[in-house]
Amino acid sequence: MIVNSCQLNVVSVEKSIFSGVIKKIYVMGVEGELGIFPGHSPLLTLIKPGLLKIFQVYNNEYLYLSGGILEVQPTVITILADVAIRAKDLDEKKVRDSKRLSEEKIKKMRHGDVDYIKISMEISKAIAQLRLIELTKK
């Protein structure tokens, strides 16, 4: 029997962010982007900061995840996110300013500096948040 939909639950430390029936999702795993469809083999993996693309029957939704854990069962997908943010909750000016400041800091550093990786991650997070803002403007 072919399964056409499954339940997705996205939960952060603070609250439930999304709960509903979906057709598929795309999320950034530690090995790259994962496409998860109903009936997928069981999976437990870490997720990296990036976009969660949710495809429902009649609409799509996008969230920013700062990382977390993805559990997949054939009929239920659960994401335990460190932080999950909807586009409407992001301040585009703040995100752009944060990205610009981080880029200025990193230009003054050398690759061996302790904070180089931390600031690189901040830039990656800002880029993902800006992608989310752009996707929801369309």
From Swiss-Prot:
It comes from the Bacteria. GO terms for molecular function: ATP binding; proton-transporting ATP synthase activity, rotational mechanism. InterPro entries: ATP_F1_dsu/esu_C_sf, ATP_synth_F1_dsu/esu, ATP_synth_F1_dsu/esu_N, ATP_synth_F1_esu_C, ATPsynth_dsu/esu_N. Its main location: membrane. It holds the Pfam family ATP-synt_DE. It is a peripheral membrane protein. Keywords: ATP synthesis, Cell inner membrane, Cell membrane, CF(1), Hydrogen ion transport, Ion transport, Membrane, Transport. GO terms for cellular component: plasma membrane; proton-transporting ATP synthase complex. It is found in: Cell inner membrane. The keyword Cytoplasm does not apply. Produces ATP from ADP in the presence of a proton gradient across the membrane. NCBIfam families: ATP_synt_epsi (TIGR01216), PRK00571.1-4 (NF001847). Belongs to the ATPase epsilon chain family. F-type ATPases have 2 components, CF(1) - the catalytic core - and CF(0) - the membrane proton channel. CF(1) has five subunits: alpha(3), beta(3), gamma(1), delta(1), epsilon(1). CF(0) has three main subunits: a, b and c. This is ATP synthase epsilon chain. The gene is atpC.
